[in-house]
Amino acid sequence: KGVTSHLISTVPEIEKYIEPHGEIGKFLAMRFKEYNSIHKGWSKEIWDMAAVGYVLNEDWAPTNTIPSPILLDDMKWASDKNRHPIKIVYEIKRDPILKDFIQKLENFNNK
């Protein structure tokens, strides 16, 4: 699993903090709940919020810079220090990302 496995939520959290906030909140809650019919003890990654969180605040998704890996024909990875650099996110800070989203949803709904 990647780092987005740490950016999870549950149906009770979505129902309490997302669903009450207008039509968009209802829609997002519906989509979240439709993903699995058994909600007891269930949580789900909200992977698409990770990319947005990084764009909004790089501190919410710290990175390391490494040379771009090379995918070989045998589906293994090789490295070459001369390749262009890429950033790898090594941690997702779930709480500030979700708090920011919920606050923005509340503000939008209260306009």
What would you call each of these model-derived segments?
Residues 1-111:
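N-terminal acidic, glycine/proline-rich low-complexity segments
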